[in-house]
Amino acid sequence: MHFHLFYVYLRLFWRNGCNNTITRKRNTMKIKFISLASGSSGNCYFIGTDAYGILVDAGIGIRTIKKHLKDLGIGLDTIRAVLITHDHADHIKAVGHLGEKFGIPVYSTPEVHIGINKSYCVTEKLSTSVRYLNKGTQIQIEDLSITAFEVPHDGTDNVGYCIEADGKIFSFLTDLGHITSTAAEYICRANYLILEANYDEEMLKMGPYPQYLKERIAGPNGHMSNRETAEFLAENITERLKYIWLCHLSKDNNHPELAYKTVELLLRSKGVLVGKDVQLIALKRNTPSELYEFE
């Protein structure tokens, strides 16, 4: 009897083990994303894994960055790079400290690096931490494949970032005056999209800003309005897109509920239901978002 059972187990082992017919679950990489701050007074985003991560922009104070990361159990020693989109103060405030004091490589185009070191808000000028990248050329940082691409904005030079890992595609477009064909390509590739919805058109029109500033914001190299972002998404949303985070909201000309509602209504008009077909979040200016984890 015992011999018979042993024989049966041996046959099963041989068939399933040696002939490799056991179905094994593919190991997937957990990708984490959080917005530490998103708005016209400061921007900083984390994307990474349990072991390491990178920052996209560093436009808030170094102490604030350290505190938010510590609250998440993330040490600065696990940050492999800082990617800078452009040289405006709300994107580079802490980059000198991160690069030169903590030795974290800072990636951007040569023109942006020149702009960073000319900026009044960067007291620690970059030298040993400088890493150049070219738009359209992919670089690799750990398991993250990163491509910078051109976006229209009025900084020295301006890029968005496409970050791919384990089949997951994140596209960051934080400041842009309009959506070009290149920007549209990276938006439509994304599973996870961080896209600007800076201002409500009526709030900007009726607000206290001087006329030249209103024209700059609404111009082709300024910022995206809620309506413009909503219309593009409604006409171009793909089935692969799972999450949309509306970013870089203006303090004076927008608020999260209005941005969310504008996009949600236009998506619904095209038969796309938020919460079912896609997730939609309007990021807050000075408060970290929840930590999102994707496998």
Which residue ranges define each predicted feature?
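Cap/insert and terminal regions of metallo-dependent hydrolase folds
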Residues: 181-281
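Metallo-beta-lactamase
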Residues: 110-160, 164-167
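Active-site neighborhood of phospho(di)ester-bond hydrolases with catalytic His/Asp-centered motifs
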Residues: 56-59, 80-87, 107-110, 171-174, ...
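Structured catalytic core of nucleotide-sugar glycosyltransferases
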Residues: 34-44, 86-91, 95, 106, ...
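Active-site metal-binding motif and surrounding structural segment of the metallo-beta-lactamase
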Residues: 62-109
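Short hydrophobic alpha-helical segments enriched in small aliphatic residues
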Residues: 3-10, 17, 21
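Active-site environment of divalent metal-dependent phosphoester hydrolases
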Residues: 41, 88-92, 114-115, 156, ...
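Conserved beta-strand hairpin/beta-sheet module of binuclear metal-dependent hydrolase folds
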Residues: 9-15, 26-72, 157-175, 192
